[in-house]
C-alpha cells in the first residue's frame, strides 16, 4: 500500500513538473519567430494578399488549441508584446504622418471609409457571435435546464 502511494506521489510530481516547466524568453521568442516564419512562407504561396501577421495569429491559435504549442511556451513574450503594443504601433503612426499630403486630398472620403468599415466590422462581429450561439458552441440556459432534471 505504501509503495502504491509513493508511486502515485512520484507520478504527480512528474505531472506537476511538466505543468510548471519554465521556458526562457529566448525559447518563447524563438517559438513565435518560427510561427511567423511559417506564416511568411504561407503568405508567399497564397493567391490573395493576406498579411503574414494575421496568418501567424491564426497559426498560433490553432497550435495552442491543438496542444502543439503550450501556453507556457509563448506566455511571457506574448504578454510583454501586448503590454508594449502602443510602442510597437509608433512606426505605423509615423508612416501615416508621412502620408499626410495624400490624406489631405480627400479627408471626407477617408472619414466616410473609416465609419463604414467600422460599422461593417461591428455587423459582422454581431452576426458571427449570433451564429456561434445558435450553433450550440456556447450552450444556452434552455439546454442546461433540459439536461439538469435528467441526472436527478
Swiss-Prot record:
Organism from which the protein derives: Staphylococcus epidermidis (strain ATCC 12228 / FDA PCI 1200)
Membrane topology: Multi-pass membrane protein
NCBIfam families: PRK04125.1
GO biological process assignments: cytolysis; killing of cells of another organism; programmed cell death
HAMAP family named in the record: LrgA
Protein name per its UniProtKB record: Antiholin-like protein LrgA
Record-linked InterPro entries: Antiholin-like_LrgA, LrgA/CidA
This protein's UniProt keywords: Cell membrane, Cytolysis, Membrane, Transmembrane, Transmembrane helix
